[in-house]
Amino acid sequence: MLQRLEQLQMQTSNILKELHSTSIFTDSTTSQLHNGGENSVMDTEESSAIDKLSASLQQVNISSPSVPTSQSRVTQGQSLGNTQISNPTSKTNNVRAKARNIRNPSQRLRPSTSLARLSNNAPRIPKEASLHENSISSKESPSVTTSKHVATITKPSTSSIARMSSNARIAAIPRAKSSMAVRSPSRLGNGPNVRSPKVGFNAKSDDSPVVKSPGSNDKPSASPRISVRSLGNSSVVRPPTRTSTTRPLSRVNVTNASGSISKNSTSPSKVKVNASTKIVRPVSAAQTVRPGSRIFRENSASNTQRPNVSATSNSTVRVASSLAVRPVSRNAQARTPSRLEQREVNVKNSSAKIVRPGTSLGVRSPSRIQSTLSSRTTTGNVRTKAANIVRPSSSINRRPPSSINQRPPSNLRILAPSRSRATIHERPSSSILHRHAHSLTSSSFSTKTLATTKEIQNSPTLVESSTVVHHDPSYLQNQTSEINDTNHSSHSSPLDLNRMI
């Protein structure tokens, strides 16, 4: 196929030499009729050249019986032109008119450009070279190439552009190597720095020369990077457009408030970088299961007032997060610990203390009872009559005096005065109360012992013994002496009970 194209080019060059040697002005009048008198000399030369070209191409078509597909389009277009010019004396005017109608100014500009390309390397023509102009119209190919300076038929403009693109690809390879000298292409990603295939793909559109200074065609952000990298310095801090990639140097400046900065920090170099900088995290992100060195290294830097933070192990951090109680935050200098954090310490330290809602009053009450009892009994008002029988039931269970009076007096068991003098002076009431404080709150008071306690008016030791009678029911049940005196059992009036309650 290339040999066939070379033969056609040789024949056209011979025809052009004949055209330049002979001057033909025979059909000037008819060309002025068709063209309006503007380009009469050009049209007469073109019309006469069409006749000679068609005659020479008809001889070539007879000598080549089997031609490939790209060549067959050329021969089809030439054969259509040949059938019209087979009788040259009668149909030359029709051929001129049709060839003139096909042409437009953009196609008239092409032969002058294709001449310079032919002079460089004429025999090297790609396979799909002749497809471009012959697909425009079947009769165009004889007429386009027949001005004064044209030397080819099947040399379209795409072949030179294809050759320019092949040259551009060759020239783009050392440029790509020079710009990628430090970084391998796998580390590039799809950032703004990938510019080596851009020259090869887009070179068909612009015919500008390719080899230039290294960063002139590209974005202005690329040129200082190339100049630095050409010095062989690989430790270059990247500009801040590259902060989205997973480099440890670029991740230092990113203070991420959502805690996602700990996702990518797996390599030890990133852990070192993050540990040296102070990153304020939320509380939940700091409690994830991580090696404890990085968390507590920040604590020792930020919390200088609390030296025992670094001593806490990793398991306590996990327990605090699993209890759904907010743990101590990482910058604890600024605020006092909240109420949840104070309760969290109690939950960690005592595992046996299970607070149920029914007995929540029983858990808190011993300290209150002890404080009220110690404040009332240790004052100097102990020996006054009705104000010193301390009963928690007065604040918890208020009962009317009618229910107290319904009890029979035989159920009362009070210490005898002789027993109480011996025991109470040996151990005072405050130690007894302190001893039996927990048994008071955990055991339910029987209303029998609560309600039927009477005021004893005789001696101050009996006043103290009445407190022992009330607050120690287990001690009362062991006593065998029953008081049946009418002084203590029968003469207590409802007024005294009302004063007591």
Swiss-Prot record:
Biased composition (Polar residues): 61-95, 103-122, 132-168, 253-274, 367-381, 478-495
One GO term describing the cellular component: cytoplasmic microtubule
Example of a GO biological process term: intracellular distribution of mitochondria
Biased composition (Low complexity): 234-252
Cellular compartments annotated: Cytoplasm, Cytoskeleton
Top-level taxonomic group: Eukaryota
Region called Disordered, residue ranges: 61-274, 328-381, 478-501
Reported consequences of knocking out the gene: Leads to mitochondria aggregation and segregation defects.
Keywords: Cytoplasm, Cytoskeleton, Meiosis, Microtubule
Molecular function per GO: microtubule binding
Disulfide bonds: none
Job description of the protein: Involved in the cell polarity process and in regulation of microtubule growth. Has a role in meiosis. Involved in microtubule dynamics. Binds to mitochondria and microtubules, attaching the tubular mitochondria to the microtubule lattice at multiple discrete interaction sites.
The protein's name in its UniProt record: Microtubule-associated protein mmb1
Gene source species: Schizosaccharomyces pombe (strain 972 / ATCC 24843)
Gene that this polypeptide is encoded by: mmb1
